[in-house]
Amino acid sequence: MIERGKFRSLTLVNWNGFFARTFDLDELVTTLSGGNGAGKSTTMAAFITALIPDLTLLHFRNTTEAGATSGSRDKGLHGKLRAGVCYSTLDVVNSRHQRVLVGVRLQQVAGRDRKVDIKPFTIQGLPTAIQPTQILTQIVGDRQARVLSLQELKERVEEMEGVQFKQFNSITDYHSLMFDLGVVPRRLRSASDRSKFYRLIEASLYGGISSAITRSLRDYLLPENSGVRKAFQDMEAALRENRMTLEAIRVTQSDRDLFKHLISEATSYVAADYMRHANERRIHLDGALELRRDLFSSRKQLSSEQYRHVEMARELTEQNDTEGDLETDYQAASDHLNLVQTAMRQQEKIERYNADLEELSYRLEEQNEVVEEARDQQAENEERADAAELEVDELKSQLADYQQALDVQQTRAIQYQQAQQALERARTLCQLPDLTAENADEWLDSYQAREQEATEILLMLEQKLSVADAAHGQFEQAYQLVSKIAGAVSRSEAWQVARDLLRDSSSQRYQAERVQPLRMRLSELEQRLREQQDAERLLQDFSKRNGQDYQPEELESLQQELDARIETLSSLVAEAGERRMTLRQELEQTQQRIQKLTARAPVWLAAQETLTQLSEQSGETFEDSRQVTEFMQQLLERERETTVERDDIAARKRQIEAQVDRLSQPGGSEDPRLNALAERFGGVLLSEIYDDVTLDDAPYFSALYGPSRHAIVVSDLSLIRDQLAGLEDCPEDLYLIEGDPQSFDDSVFAVDELERAVVVKVAERQWRYSRFPEVPLFGRAAREMRLEGLRDEREALAEQYATLSFDVQKTQRLHQSFSRFIGTHLAVVFDEDPEAEIRTLSSRRGELDRAMASFDGENQQQRQQYEQAKEASGQLNKLIPRISLLCDETLQDRVEEIRAELDETEESARFIQQHGVTLTKLEPLVSVLQSDPQQHEQLQEDYTQAQNAQRQAKQQAFTLTEVVQRRAHFSYADSAGMLGENAGLNDKLRHRLEQAEAERTKAREQLRQHQTQLTQYSQVQASLKSSYDAKQDMLKELLQELQDIGVRADADAEARARQRRDELHAALSTNRSRRNQLEKQITFCEAEMDSVQKKLRKLERDYHQMREQVVTAKAGWCTVMRLVKDNGVERRLHRRELAYMEGDELRSMSDKALGALRLAVADNEHLRDVLRLSEDPKRPERKIQFYIAVYQHLRERIRQDIIRTDDPVEAIEQMEIELNRLTEELMAREQMLAISSRSVANIIRKTIQREQNRIRMLNQGLQAVSFGQVKSVRLNVNVRETHTTLLNVLSEQQEMHQDLFNSNRLTFSEALAKLYQRLNPEIDMGQRTPQTIGEELLDYRNYLEMEVEVNRGADGWLRAESGALSTGEAIGTGMSILVMVVQSWEEESKRLRGKDIIPCRLLFLDEAARLDAKSIATLFELCDRLEMQLVIAAPENISPEKGTTYKLVRKVYQNNEHVHVVGLRGFGTETPETQEPAS
């Protein structure tokens, strides 16, 4: 009997507290006992690390971290190690009694992340005497040892003979070896498998019901049905492969379309370029000839333009010279007009100033007289006012003195003093030192008489002065008038000059009256002179234009000649227009006919090309439309016959395929209903039992069982008797045999074997004789042999069917081609050749073009002559009315005479105009000039002296009068007499003072009034004098300016000057217009010459280039034609309909095809390179080479086994037919490969039933397990309701959902997912694809719901949840579930490992003290019954009488921390020695 593998020991090297410690593991339970921090969890962590060295999974948390989202930073491993190399190894002995040391090397990695480096390794073949610590450490002293590095360990192991050391770089390889050696219960292929294993170990370590496991019990307990899944995958793969083949066919069809597209685009690309080059070659030849004709005509045109340019340049030079003269004359006329206008304005100003001066002179004389009179009166008033003022002052002084004397006692003295003062003033003023108060009267009389005499003398001189002033004013006025007219004249010659001026004024007035008639006469003559000059210029211009000098007398006869010539040319031009219109109409008709034929020619050529192709395909020649329709009827008959023969072959083929399908049924059942019945009855088909029978025995067994070879073998017939009552869907004869399907034999029949036959005794009175069948079908080998023959026959029929299908499709395509031809081209294909008529019409069009060109040249020359004659006639019409002017030769002399006479009269008129008023004033005053009153100044001086003497005499008389009046003051008689005299004198003085003040007031008022009046008179005089002087100065300036202007300012001068200027402006404008016209014509002519020269140069260049292109293209064209003819592609490339397309259209067609070809040949390096080379426009032969390369490439791709042609175009057509046939066959094959939804449902149901039975057997092993109040534990398995509905629909209602399973777009998995969604629309599928959901639905595990139930106390069976159980009960229940999982894994992996290997079983339990003694005993019993090892940890000893117990105590010794370990193997056994690891 094979023994189960066991873990012998666990070794820790250089762990925290354990330097080199080996724990021997008990075959059942190993207990680690110790206080908190003793090292129990560290020991278990070392075990788990060696078992699952995956840092992504390892996480050794404390029980206090149960509610935390994350554990310690180093996941509990870094802190359990010491610095340096650490080891954790497991010593295992497997079922083969092989010792294997599996473990890991651990080492802390420096850094703040607290990482740990792990390296797994194994050592096989290690002798039993060698302990793990001996090989992992090296003794270096009596009590010292060091840990070996992994490399040193490897070297040490390799030195041992028969010992193998293996280091692993991947955890998968490590676990794979552990599975093969029986260390782990299942193969851990992926991280998911490792995670499940770690979750199981973790769940056992921490105890309780692990939600991570209970939530996914299906993944832990139910094995993956890889066989069924692989069958489904194979079916889908076959379908996928079939569909991929179909897709490949479609791709091939697209490739065929691509090839067709390639040949089509290549033909378009090369043919368009080929025909474009052919067209361009023809166009270049025609262009070269046309350029040569244009070159000759341009040279002729250039000569004509050059001659015309010379003539116009000469005329322009003359016009420029004339324009310079006219501009000079026009500028002079404009200046003269400006001077005349200025002189006219000056003359107007002079006349206005003369009138103003006459008026001012008269007013100034009057004002002078008024001012003189006012001055005299003012002088008298001043004297009178001064005298009155003196008198008042004297009287006031006297009155004041007398008043003062009356007021005080000294009045007499004051009066005396005043009298003395008056006497002194009188002496001084009168220059009389001997004057006294006594002789004052005498002197007063004499001075009064002297005053009277001076006054009389003054009055006499004033009268003389007044008379002298009058005579002197007339003489000065007359003298000023003479000086104004004649300039500076002496006073003695003034009278003679005045007489001469008055004598000459009469003749000058007569001359002034003749100015206007002379001006009118001169204006008329000047106008005629200008007209004569204009006529002479017109005559000169006319002579220049006609190239001949003409006399005025010859103009009338020349006019008659021109009129006759114009009439002749007009009739010729009119006739030429009619003739040209006739030629134009004929040319347009010809062009319209050519256009119609050109538009019809491509259609006709395309129809001819199609007719040629149809003739080649059919091998017939067609002359008219009747033959075409008759041949179509023949095609229909041929197609009908071939179709009938093809359908017969298809029927035979279907029969064979039905036989193949029937023989291909699983288990050899020819009727699918038998499989359902066998499943229903719980039996097995007899054909399945004998499925492995050999080919030689197949005839015997087939004859042996005869009609019952399709029977169903059941274990008990009585059990199915009731089911037969309602049986409907079954064969007519259903055979049932009772027997054990696992050990069935043929002993149920009594049989005698004959020569190739058997006799079967069915009953006592019934025998059956059966011959061996010629083709036995009993057993898989016989069926496969028959299937092979049927398949061969089917292949032959398929080939024959393919040939007939090919012929039918070929006939159909030919019929379709004829149908398209009739609908598209039959109306035009048998018409006359339009190209022949186009060539005839093109020749006629060329003749018409040449005739019209010649005619246009003649017509243009006639039109030029006609225009020239009309222009000359117009000029003559202007000259003929002026012939008399041209013949008048005395006109210039008469103009000069009148102009000289007019100058004289204008001079006299200007003199009269300037001095006429002055002469009129001078005429009555001329006699005054005969005598000059020279004594006027002396009389004026005498008058002034007399006036001064009179004023002095008056003052002297006044002072003497004052002395005489104060004479009494010089002596007083007494005081009373002096007072009385003073009182009388006071009254007298007062009376005189009043009179004097009244006179003074009156004198002041008169003086003020006269002073105001004199001021006004003086202001008016000054204003008039100023105005007179200003206007006199302005008049002098105006006269000087008029003299400086030097023109006559008469009434008609401005009109004449303006008329002259306007005439010259009109002539200048006409000249400039002609000059501008000539300049424009010269510019246009030069531009035309430049254009013609550029055109000529371009034509020469283009002509030479065109000739070079023609020559070069000829060589290249010869190469192209040689390639085309040598390779036989001329018929495909020379597409005559393309000749009617423009070069741009052909280039666009070629470019579009090139773009499509680049995409088409992107994956073909050779064609891509050839295409790239063909893009060179200078090498057209490379496009032909590309076309040839495309044809060669397609010829190489032709399958000669199915296509019988070398022409790629025909091969493409045959390929299309063949691909259609293959598509039909593959679609039929896909229907054969389709997965039956009913069979899928049956397979899933069978698998579910098998797994439910397996779970029930696992439950039997847990029925006796009890923990606390938990009496029993079981695993409940149910099928989900939604999935049950899905299975029912798949098996019974699949017809309702054939739209999913018959769709070519969906795989079976996708169809299954769509059906599931259709049945359960309320379920959210999330982001998963239908393929993923379908694959899940093909896995039976997804149909099951699993949960753990416990039988607890009075509650009965309830769901196992931690909240409903105590801690111990939960730990025990969880441990039971884990044991079930381990058992399930072992059974699942049994077929994957060696038959002589039973894997180790080991679980963990930390903090086992939470279990009571009964539960612990149950655990021990469970481990004993299941041959399972268990490692538990608890603070106290648990059941020390069983298993092995280790007591751990952590101590500090000499500043070093270590764990003291004591081991106990049950009660009564010997205690091992205490071991203390070296520190």
From Swiss-Prot:
Entry coiled-coil feature ranges: 337-418, 511-604, 780-810, 847-1116, 1206-1265
UniProt-annotated location(s): Cytoplasm, Nucleoid
Gene giving rise to this polypeptide: mukB
Keyword Signal: no
Descriptive protein name: Chromosome partition protein MukB
Molecular function in Gene Ontology: ATP binding; DNA binding
PANTHER family: CHROMOSOME PARTITION PROTEIN MUKB, DUF4476 DOMAIN-CONTAINING PROTEIN
Protein family: Belongs to the SMC family. MukB subfamily.
Species lineage: Bacteria, Pseudomonadati, Pseudomonadota, Gammaproteobacteria, Enterobacterales
Domain comment quoted from the record: The hinge domain, which separates the large intramolecular coiled coil regions, allows the homodimerization, forming a V-shaped homodimer.
Summary of subunit composition and partner proteins: Homodimerization via its hinge domain. Binds to DNA via its C-terminal region. Interacts, and probably forms a ternary complex, with MukE and MukF via its C-terminal region. The complex formation is stimulated by calcium or magnesium. Interacts with tubulin-related protein FtsZ.
Domain of life, source organism: Bacteria
Annotated organism of origin: Pectobacterium atrosepticum (strain SCRI 1043 / ATCC BAA-672)
Pfam families, per the entry: MukB, MukB_hinge, SbcC_Walker_B
Region described as Flexible hinge: 666-783
Record's keyword annotation contains Cytoplasm: yes
Biological role stated in the UniProt entry: Plays a central role in chromosome condensation, segregation and cell cycle progression. Functions as a homodimer, which is essential for chromosome partition. Involved in negative DNA supercoiling in vivo, and by this means organize and compact chromosomes. May achieve or facilitate chromosome segregation by condensation DNA from both sides of a centrally located replisome during cell division.
Predominant cellular place of this UniProt entry's protein: cytoplasm
Alphabetized HAMAP family for the sequence: MukB
